[in-house]
Amino acid sequence: MGQVSLYVESLGEGPDLVLLHGWAMHSGMWGSTRRSLAQHFRLHLVDLPGHGFSRGALPYKRGEKNGVSEDMVERVVEVLPPDCVICGWSLGGQLAIELALREPARVEKIILTSTTPSFVKREDWQWGMEELTLKAFAENLRRDFSTTMKRFLTLQVSGGGDAGKVLPEMRRLLFERSAPEPEALEAGLQIVLANDLRGKLRNIVQPTLLIHGENDVIAHPEAAAWMKQQFQDVELAMLPNCSHVPFLSYPDKFIANIVRFAR
């Protein structure tokens, strides 16, 4: 029996722009920005393996030490259009970094939204979360997905001036599709825990745009400032009073930055 392909929704006309969502999410989370971006680009919204409408697209290998799971990278490469721009949110941004390194002839530019080279705090990296906190979260996720995900969404909007508006929208969008496969959640967690991409950023030759909320509590804004010093060709758009989901909090600014950079 053949391997199930990833689900990709394509819409709009123009340069190819690929959107990659974060851990435990799906491509529907981009919300109304999908239609807005489709006015400027040929948009490709990917559901990562085991997520959203790609629930059957398994197996899913464990995260490699110091790198995104090769399996995840390979699965996205299969659906990647030539000469594209990749916009990755959170963990999807780490995947965009790996794709830019692996497919330099196909990836023209990358946009890293609310991304960090390491989500985990390390001895020489203070702008991450405690490993025990992430492991406890994963255990709670296994026990009660719905309740734990609602808490995770609350964390994502924390620090934003419009959390009261964005949180209900995120909840509505998340539960429009089925929960991710447990195997995909576990593999994603292993990637989050293992990934440390700091040493790879200087090897990125593509122009890079960083879009970050200055009050992000998941991907610390200091991580974005640090990344700005590492890339060869980079811009940083730091959005004030913004959390981990700038595309829902400030869609107009988010879209304007992408159109200016990627068109």
Curated annotation (Swiss-Prot):
Group of enzyme by EC: hydrolase
Record's subcellular location: Cytoplasm
Alphabetically ordered keywords of this record: Biotin biosynthesis, Cytoplasm, Hydrolase, Serine esterase
Gene Ontology CC annotation, any one: cytoplasm
EC annotation from Swiss-Prot or TrEMBL: 3.1.1.85
Catalytic activity: 6-carboxyhexanoyl-[ACP] methyl ester + H2O = 6-carboxyhexanoyl-[ACP] + methanol + H(+)
PANTHER family in alphabetical order: HYDROLASE ALPHA/BETA FOLD FAMILY, PIMELOYL-[ACYL-CARRIER PROTEIN] METHYL ESTER ESTERASE
Name listed for the protein in its UniProt record: Pimeloyl-[acyl-carrier protein] methyl ester esterase
Organism from which the protein derives: Nitrosospira multiformis (strain ATCC 25196 / NCIMB 11849 / C 71)
Encoding gene (name): bioH
